[in-house]
Amino acid sequence: MDTETGGLDPAQNPITSFAAVVLDFNTLKEVDRWETYVKPYNDLQITKESIQKTMVNMAEVNRGMELNAFIDAFMRFCTQNFADTKGKDQRRLVAVGHNVMFDVGMLEAAFYYSAYGKKQSLFNYIQDQTLDTMYLSKMMYGLTGDEKMTLGATCERAGIILTDAHGAMNDV
């Protein structure tokens, strides 16, 4: 999963877009995908720097989902894709992404700012343990921390062509 945001601080900057892909862990085949823009909410600011870095189309963002509709759709997406096939328990999504705790923090703040406030938790839908491709890359390539750890640099090391970075679905 990936979020694009109006800045780096969940208390001051909103999510502007979100994307997720569901994979079958046995076959690694895509099961579902979802991408959406999210309208700015709670008077949070979208910085000029984030607009330049992500090249976000503000017209698309302003036509995006309202925050409460986004949270409702996120919960539905998780539930329909991760419900136990026997109907006993709802399993929770394993959040996978590059520097994924940033995305988790942004989603957690969005839940808080929504009409659900503290009544509904992001962690009812995703596990509190994540799989971070940035850390996997460090381990796989024996990196010490001084190297560039962006998604683009990681893809280059792995021989993956990353086009249009900072588009939520492209980064997934």
Describe each region flagged by the PLM:
Residues 128-146:
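Short alpha-helix plus adjacent loop in nuclease-associated cores
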Residues 170:
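Acidic donor-binding loop at a coil-to-helix junction in glycosyltransferase catalytic cores
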Residues 147-151:
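Juxtamembrane/interfacial segments flanking transmembrane helices
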Residues 103-129:
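Substrate-recognition/cap helix-loop segment adjacent to the acidic, metal-dependent catalytic center
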Residues 111-116, 141-142, 156-159:
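A generic structural signal for secondary-structure junctions
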Residues 1-108, 152-161, 166:
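Conserved non-catalytic scaffold segment of RNase H-like nuclease domains
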